Amino acid sequence: MSYDLLSERYDELVRFDYDGLFAAIKPSFVPSGAALDLCSGTGTFALKLSEAGFKVTCVDNSPKMLTEAAKKARAARRQLLFLQADVNSLKIYGKYSLITSTCDGFNYVKSEENLKKLFGKIHDALTENGVLAFDVSTLYKAENVLSGQTFFEDTPTYTLFWTARKIEDGKIGTDVSVFKKEGDGYKREDGFFVQYFYRNETYKRLLEQQGFDVKFSDGETYGDLNEKSNRLLVVARKK
């Protein structure tokens, strides 16, 4: 499943701290030139990059997510470029001083080999001293918070059930059912997606192999990372 099913409700459901994340990574870059936002979703973070002074390209695998992002850009009178692509088979054209991915985008990279290739492509696409910044849910969160849990959201226009289950180590499958209000009844839509979780040391090793200097922090507090951190924030600078 792509995120098409959730596109119209994504911002309401996720409630992600984009402001906090932007403030956390802002000291690592100079806001000029081109930025590439991978797995950009509805474009909230991309708009922040645009407002900061970047010329921004948004990449996402969901056409409906990109449609929502384009609506936001028009409303904000911002010119962004939108491209549909899967991060697992991504081709990057051009050069960027900043490449980002927020809110678990890289949790959809399906293998360590794909992750290694992606980091290599990003390194090649960055300008000298360019920065890659991304955040992911940790393996600790997958095993201790997500696995076996059911989440529920009820609003006047829709009801959503979200059940996560462990498929194997480092791999969580999520069943999603959305009941959308239509007249006197509801229309049901179902979906399923898989997320992939890697050890923090794996990200560090693969990034360093591709030529990055790497800094980790907690992706929720933006302080020091610890073994029970639910989110990992990575700022990696091209050597």
What are these regions (language model features)?
Residues 44-89:
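Class I SAM-dependent methyltransferase SAM/SAH-binding core
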Residues 102-104:
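Residues lining the SAM
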Residues 1-41:
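Conserved class I S-adenosyl-L-methionine
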Residues 113, 133-204:
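SAM-dependent methyltransferase
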Residues 200-239:
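C-terminal lobe and adjacent flexible extensions of AdoMet/dcAdoMet transferase-like proteins
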